[in-house]
């Protein structure tokens, strides 16, 4: 896989583009749980597929490249991006995951975004893994999804480049002292530890969408 340092881009792939929309790239039709159980019994869906499912559940929206990098963070060798993409394709065909891409006035996006599908939630529940996903989550607008993708990249960058990296939280929550209102930072949070001392960083991602200044203040 090409390293991040080798990619020369003037504009972030997660920046907003004029006229950008989200386009469905998943599977239509019906898949039964019996079909999925058969695939598991036949060895077509294995432990690494379940790990991928857990990663998507944790991050909500994520690219295949980010999944690759997080698998490496967990000490799992995906072998190659093509092999990982084949596994993702299998999960999409089984309606365990679904997939989208962005299109804009500049053309079709170069990456796919993966998120949970109904069968994925069933499988997570069967393993007693917490899954707060609702089908309506997949209707979130482009701006919200790109914030999540940018937040994913912050977490990955800290893990790969900062020796003091300790842990991360995808959706850290802050509670206002006076109002008691809970805010969830869109960029995630990381904990750095060195010489027995720890410090937490929480990130808020801003995308230049319509009314972005007002949304940021709110």
Locations of the language-model features?
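Basic, amphipathic alpha-helical patches used to engage nucleic acids or provide basic targeting signals
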Residues: 212-218
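Nuclease-adjacent, charged terminal/linker segments that flank catalytic cores
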Residues: 1-128, 138
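Glycine-rich, often proline-containing surface loops adjacent to acidic residues and nearby aromatics
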Residues: 63-64, 130-137, 197-203
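Amphipathic alpha-helical dimerization/coiled-coil segments
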Residues: 124-169
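Active-site metal-binding core of divalent-cation-utilizing nuclease and nuclease-like domains
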Residues: 143, 155-199, 204-212
């Amino acid at each position: 896989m090409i390293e991040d340092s080798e990619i020369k881009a003037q504009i972030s792939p997660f920046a907003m583009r004029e006229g950008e929309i989200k386009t469905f790239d998943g599977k239509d039709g019906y898949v039964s749980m019996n079909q999925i159980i058969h695939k598991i019994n036949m060895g077509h869906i294995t432990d690494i597929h379940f790990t991928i499912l857990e990663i998507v559940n944790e991050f909500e929206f994520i690219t295949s490249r980010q999944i690759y990098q997080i698998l490496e963070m967990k000490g799992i060798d995906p072998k190659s991006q093509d092999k990982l993409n084949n596994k993702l394709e299998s999960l999409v065909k089984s309606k365990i995951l679904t997939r989208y891409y962005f299109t804009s006035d500049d053309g079709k996006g170069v990456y796919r975004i993966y998120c949970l599908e109904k069968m994925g939630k069933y499988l997570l529940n069967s393993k007693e893994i917490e899954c707060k996903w609702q089908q309506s989550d997949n209707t979130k607008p482009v701006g919200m999804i790109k914030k999540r993708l940018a937040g994913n990249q912050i977490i990955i960058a800290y893990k790969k480049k900062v020796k003091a990296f300790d842990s991360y939280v995808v959706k850290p929550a802050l509670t206002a002292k006076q109002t008691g209102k809970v805010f969830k930072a869109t960029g995630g949070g990381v904990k750095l530890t060195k010489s027995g001392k720890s410090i937490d960083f929480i990130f808020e991602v801003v995308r230049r969408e319509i009314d972005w200044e007002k949304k940021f203040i709110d």
